[in-house]
């Protein structure tokens, strides 16, 4: 929060790396630098330790020695996909970043009627003082039959589940693989997400079997694991704003430890209705002009 622009954050990272003794040049940072930083944070060996038995007051000692992992600590990102405000894929997203484009806009009417909830000035109960958001285009479009999901069930699925399914499929394709070849493999799925507000739009869906699974964050990563028969862990993580980074960190830990051979990791967040927007405004977390000033 102390660095409100990409340039300021970049300068901060450079300073931190210089303090660690890593040489930074004006050219693109090489993969050798990132590997040095990554390896410096991980002990090369794990020393054995003595554990005392607690059973029946036993004073016996258990010698537990852990051998250093023989697996490489280098991790390759071989595929990437995603949708973002005013960017339908990662290529356009990168162009927006490079150009410094502001992708925040007024809340579109097709998302919800902001005029019913907007009130300028101080926060008022049930109202929001901000009318801005980063809105995804076509977030409600989905081909359920492609994923062997019935249209009835798809209607009860939070858009976060649908979008993550699509993003995982496109990520594997982007890596140059047929997604179905991963069947039976130790591929883990890690996603940063939070409970959505989609089902609050329909009381009927809240009380249905489809709504029970369609709104569950634990089901969100399991969808792609089930569809592709992935045998690694499927874990949803909610640590607020850091959820996606924590998900990726967990995936890296799994790869280094050898518990998985590959991973799908990322994050998803969609506000389908006004509830979360209003709550955030009530907490004073939103900007009245749609721009960050911290």
Language model features by range: what are they?
Residues 1-2, 97, 109, 157-160, ...:
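Active-site nucleophile and cofactor-binding loops and adjacent substrate-binding regions
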Residues 1-58:
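Phosphopantetheine-dependent thiolation modules in NRPS/PKS and related acyl-activating systems
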Residues 4, 41-153, 161, 170-173, ...:
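ACP-dependent fatty acid/polyketide chain-elongation machinery
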Residues 5, 9, 77-81, 97, ...:
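Conserved small-residue
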Residues 11, 87-91, 195-206, 246-249, ...:
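Short acidic, glycine/serine/threonine-rich loops at helix termini
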Residues 106-107, 218-225, 246-254, 262, ...:
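Glycine-/small-residue-rich "gating" segment that lines the acyl/pantetheine channel
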Residues 113-141, 157-223, 268-273:
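Conserved beta-ketoacyl condensing-enzyme motif
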Residues 162-180, 236-269:
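Active-site-proximal alpha-helical scaffold in enzymes
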